[in-house]
């Protein structure tokens, strides 16, 4: 060979050359395919990251401005749960979707690391076009949870999505297709996933309580949801309807604490508002029922609140406070636990502390109800802030003109009397006696519930000064 030839390997057989050329082509093609696959995978990852940020499957909302919020954002992650839409074919299932929403709010309230707005304030947006920015600014929260419920026979589909109102972005979403009997597990998982998305660590007992089943009887739960709606409205007809429904819950599942707690709470309210025909017997029943609820499930906060109501109806304000303290331990961010703690404390002779709890309840539920205004009015009266008492009860009569609760009308008249405004007191007394002709101080059981004699006497004398009769008219 005149010139040297570079060779990697000498092939001695004629067929080897063709074989090696084909093999080399295959190896090259394989490498090219691998590179292409790697490049395609990289593009998918980049696209995925971009999509996760852009979220084209969600409609981004206009961000809320913390400076325009009605309340300063709390130190904890704050959240409002909007009423879940009822997408069931049967529109009568509205109570069920409302119940799912309420239970998710309750479960979230069990998590001490969250600030959760109460049902009373979020349900004012029910049936309205949702404006996340408006909700966040009016309620003073950073996060909003919304979703839907579809129920078909023994199946449910629940969707939920969590929005950061300050950015307008969605930070978590999920769809659950489950058996109806698994509704409690779904509700608990929504609460847990929300906490996880907000980087809130659950305490061991909080995680355990989230996944407790209140009842395995879905029919009992169904009736309980209907019965619970009667608690919100304070009319006599509504309360009497609630009594029947809670009794039905107990029949369907004697091991469900909710039926006993609800019926106990209902009877205590009847006694307190003087709707009861047998107050002494109803107080005893309320006690027994609440105690059964607590024995069945010590972690059911409403059972302790109901027990507090029974204590108060029996004139034991200290017992009422002790009972609700247990509810607060179970639901530290619970609106009702703080509300009733405030209500019972002023009966126990601690109106200043009562006002603090009621202010927290107000922050948890910025949209006021008759109950919110009434409880704060009583606390301010016992705190000797009569001007604020009058303002609250005047505001209540303006917002809720059909609410003519005798005790509250008497409280307003008494406050006017202590402010030396006899003409205005007389106007309120006339309205009181027009609505409740038999009302008199000697039979005013509610006026006897205060622990301190000084408070009972102050209220009684002020009501008498306002012109409320001491004894039934004509006697």
Model-derived segments and spans:
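Cytosolic regulatory/linker segments at or just downstream of nucleotide-handling modules
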Residues: 1-23
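Short, flexible loop/turn segments with low-complexity composition
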Residues: 22, 206-211, 472-475
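Short, Lys/Arg-rich N-terminal segment immediately upstream of the first membrane anchor
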Residues: 24-31
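Acidic, proline/glycine-rich low-complexity intrinsically disordered segments
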Residues: 31-404, 408-419, 424
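Acidic, Ser/Thr-rich low-complexity linear motifs
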Residues: 210-213, 276, 437-451
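TPR/TPR-like (Sel1-like) alpha-helical repeat modules
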Residues: 417-439
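Terminal, low-structured helical/coil segments at or just beyond the last alpha-helical repeat
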Residues: 441-475
């Amino acid at each position: 060979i005149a010139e040297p030839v570079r060779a990697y390997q000498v092939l001695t057989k004629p067929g080897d050359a063709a074989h090696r050329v084909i093999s080399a082509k295959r190896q090259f093609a394989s490498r090219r395919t691998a590179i292409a696959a790697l490049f395609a995978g990289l593009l998918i990852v980049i696209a995925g990251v971009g999509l996760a940020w852009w979220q084209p499957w969600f409609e981004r909302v206009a961000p809320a401005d913390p400076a325009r919020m009605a309340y300063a954002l709390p130190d904890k992650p704050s959240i409002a749960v909007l009423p879940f839409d009822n997408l069931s074919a049967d529109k009568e299932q509205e109570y069920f979707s409302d119940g799912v929403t309420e239970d998710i709010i309750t479960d979230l309230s069990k998590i001490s690391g969250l600030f959760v707005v109460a049902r009373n304030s979020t349900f004012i947006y029910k049936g309205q076009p949702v404006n996340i920015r408006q909700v966040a600014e009016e309620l003073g929260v950073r996060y909003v949870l919304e979703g839907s419920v579809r129920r078909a026979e023994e199946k449910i589909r629940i969707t939920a999505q969590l929005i950061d109102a300050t950015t307008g972005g969605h930070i978590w979403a999920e769809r659950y297709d489950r058996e109806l009997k698994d509704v409690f597990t779904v509700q608990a998982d929504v609460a847990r996933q929300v906490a996880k998305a907000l980087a809130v660590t659950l305490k061991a007992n909080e995680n355990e309580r989230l996944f407790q089943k209140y009842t395995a009887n879905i029919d009992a739960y169904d009736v309980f949801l209907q019965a619970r709606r009667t608690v919100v409205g304070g009319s006599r007809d509504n309360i009497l309807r609630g009594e029947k429904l809670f009794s039905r819950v107990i029949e369907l599942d004697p091991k469900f604490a909710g039926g006993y707690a609800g019926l106990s709470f209902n009877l205590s309210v009847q006694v307190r508002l003087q709707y009861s025909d047998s107050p002494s017997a109803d107080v005893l029943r309320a006690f027994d029922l609440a105690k059964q609820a607590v024995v069945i499930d010590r972690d059911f906060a409403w059972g302790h609140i109901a027990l507090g109501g029974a204590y108060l109806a029996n004139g034991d304000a200290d017992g009422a406070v002790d009972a609700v303290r247990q509810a607060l331990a179970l639901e530290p961010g619970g609106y009702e636990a703080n509300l009733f703690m405030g209500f019972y404390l002023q009966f126990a002779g601690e109106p200043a502390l009562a006002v603090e709890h009621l202010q927290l309840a107000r922050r948890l539920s910025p949209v006021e109800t008759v109950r919110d205004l009434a409880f704060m009015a009583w606390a301010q009266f016992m705190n000797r802030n009569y001007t604020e008492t009058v303002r609250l009860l005047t505001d209540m009569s303006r917002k809720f003109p059909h609410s003519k609760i005798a005790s509250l009308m008497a409280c307003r008249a008494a406050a006017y009397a202590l402010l030396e405004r006899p003409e205005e007191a007389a106007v309120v007394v006339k309205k009181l006696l027009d609505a409740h002709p038999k009302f008199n101080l000697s039979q005013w059981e509610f006026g006897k519930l205060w622990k301190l004699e000084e408070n009972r006497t102050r209220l009684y004398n002020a009501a008498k000064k306002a012109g409320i009769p001491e004894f039934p008219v004509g006697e």
